[in-house]
Amino acid sequence: MPDRPENFASVFIYSDELANFEYSPTHPFKPIRAKLTLDLCRRYDLIDRPWIRIVKPEPLPFEVMAEFHDVTYLRALQTVDSAGLAELRSNVPSTPERDLLTIDPQILKYELGTDDNPVFAGVYDYSALAAGATFLGAEMVASGEVQAAFNPVGGFHHAARDHAEGFCYVNDVAVAITHLLKEGLRVAFVDIDAHHCNGVQDAFYGDDRVLVISLHESGGQLYPWSGFENEIGEGKGRGYTVNVPLPEKTDDEAFVRAFEEVVPPLLKAFAPDLVIAELGADTHISDPLTHLNMTNFGYGQVVKKLAEQIPRLLALGGGGYDVYKTVRSWTLAWAILNHLEPRDEYVGIIGGMMFGPEVEAGDLHDKTVYATGVVKERINREIDRVLDYIKQTVFPIHKIPLTLPLSRQGRG
């Protein structure tokens, strides 16, 4: 682990109020991951350090969210933020017919009240608080007060200006970036969540002050069905959106290679004032909603490369639907951001703390999984094709010299 820079400071942004929200008992998105992550960080002695603080966020005011979001949509979100609607739905058995009858069509046009985006008491307050957490982290990093910030309940990258989408109600990323742009800053957003960041991409598709880089499972097989390599921005923003769609069963080795060939040179050329990184852990092989074969071994390598290159970084949790694997990955990421080696002081103690069946001998690191044979050949061939397109189409816009792709060296 590299030495921690002098005068380094970091914040873990956390609120019990955020962690205790629940979309529904059966919904795959679990805010409780934030509390479990903080608990595991404490177990690994990753919190009680002189340079680390836990800070509690405040809800973001309506008018700040309205700098990005459509006002009528935010008002609709406020409208469904009532126990009345939640109780109306809970008192009648769930059927498609009931859902259509009990949800106002004017609300449905905002994609509120769907299976993905259920309405529940406190949904507006929850969204405003999550956005406030990301906004706080962005301000602290931008001002230089801290060099690293982590908001585990952040990264709602699917929400659009005028509707909810993909478990996301308020696009905290777009709201924060919009504010940072008003302060004259250049921002890079690096997203390694398995799902493409369609909401953030759409928000800044024509803007050359924001560099959006997303490595994700291909939209040919996974929601939101977007994020192909030829989506590179438009107008002044041409070349400032970069997508690396990954084929199913992509392993650690292939993911890290794709990241190394694209992200560091683009960040160096763009020279942002700060970087926001979405560290979604749904790329994990055990995730129930995705089809990649990564472990937190490759995930940790990528986070480490970001931490080494970026002096000011805001990290957001994003997705991850195997709760325990996600919590382990986020804990590992927090350790890396703070230049710490996680060690479990309870290993070997009879009756000591336990954290699910995945904790093996107190080590947060997974054993990597390798694709082999024709599967590996297919993965490499597809990733080579995507990387070639980016290098030939996007790199020249940023005056990045073309070199032989690392993936081809020694392969012929």
Which role does the model predict for each range below?
Residues M1-R408:
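HDAC/HDAC-like amidohydrolase catalytic core signature
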